[in-house]
C-alpha cells in the first residue's frame, strides 16, 4: 500500500504546521491498519508554498528514516493534471490546464493531454503571459486548481473553461500523488528535490539588499 505522507497544504491551501501534519500522518497510518500496513511514503514536491514544500519534504524524509519505508515524490501539477485527465476522458473533453496560485500575481501552470501526459513542463508566469501562451491551442482547455479559481476572469477571457469554485477537481488529491509516486522506479528519498520554479522570497530580499549596497 502506498501512503501519502504529505501534500503540505491545509484546507485553505496554506502550509500546515509540522506538528499538525505529523498528527494527520499518524491518524492516516492508523486508518490504514498501522505502520505495518504501509508499503511506501509519497510526498508532493511542489510547486507551491516554499514553507509547505520544505515542511512536507523534511517531514516525509524524517518518517522514511524512522520507519525504514521507501520515499517517493510527485509533482503537484502533475497530480492535478491527472485529476483533470479523469474529467476530460469521461466527458470527451479538451486538453487540461493545471493552475496553482503562485502569489505575487503569478501562476504555476502545466498543460496536459486528455491522458494526463505533459504537453508543457511546469512553468511560473503571470496570467496574461499564460493567456498568450494558450493562444496557439486549437481548443479551449479545461483548467483547475487554486490559480484557476483566483484568476477565473482572466482565464475565461482566453476561452479557458473553469469548473465552479466548489468543484473537487480544484483540490490536489492524495490518491493522484500516490499513483504518480508509485510509478517512480526509485525509492531514494535523499534524491528527491523540491520543485520551486523560482527563488524563495529570502533570496530575492538578499539580492535586493546587495544591489542597494552596491549603488
For each predicted feature, which ranges?
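Short, hydrophobic alpha-helical segments
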Residues: 29, 138, 178-186
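A general structural signal for well-ordered alpha-helical segments in protein cores
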Residues: 18-25, 60, 77, 174-178
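N-terminal beta-alpha supersecondary unit
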Residues: 1-47
Amino acid at each position: 500500500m502506498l501512503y501519502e505522507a504529505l501534500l503540505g497544504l491545509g484546507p485553505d491551501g496554506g502550509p500546515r504546521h509540522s506538528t499538525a501534519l505529523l498528527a494527520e500522518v499518524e491518524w492516516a497510518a492508523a486508518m490504514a491498519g498501522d505502520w505495518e500496513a504501509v508499503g511506501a511514503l509519497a510526498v508532493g514536491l511542489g510547486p507551491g508554498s516554499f514553507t509547505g514544500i520544505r515542511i512536507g519534504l523534511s517531514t516525509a524524509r524524517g518518517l522514511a528514516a524512522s520507519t525504514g519505508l521507501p520515499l517517493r515524490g510527485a509533482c503537484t501539477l502533475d497530480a492535478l493534471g491527472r485529476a483533470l485527465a479523469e474529467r476530460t476522458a469521461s466527458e470527451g473533453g479538451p486538453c487540461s490546464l493545471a493552475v496553482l496560485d503562485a502569489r505575487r500575481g503569478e501562476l504555476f501552470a502545466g498543460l496536459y493531454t486528455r491522458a494526463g501526459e505533459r504537453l508543457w513542463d511546469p512553468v511560473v508566469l503571470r496570467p496574461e503571459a499564460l493567456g498568450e501562451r494558450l493562444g496557439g491551442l486549437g481548443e479551449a482547455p479545461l483548467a483547475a486548481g487554486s490559480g484557476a479559481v483566483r484568476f477565473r476572469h482572466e482565464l475565461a477571457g482566453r476561452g479557458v473553461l473553469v469548473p465552479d469554485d466548489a468543484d473537487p477537481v480544484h483540490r490536489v488529491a492524495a490518491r493522484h500523488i500516490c499513483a504518480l509516486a508509485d510509478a517512480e522506479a526509485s525509492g531514494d528519498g535523499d534524491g528527491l528535490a523540491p520543485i520551486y520554479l523560482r527563488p524563495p522570497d529570502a533570496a530575492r530580499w538578499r539580492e535586493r539588499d546587495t544591489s542597494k549596497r552596491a549603488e
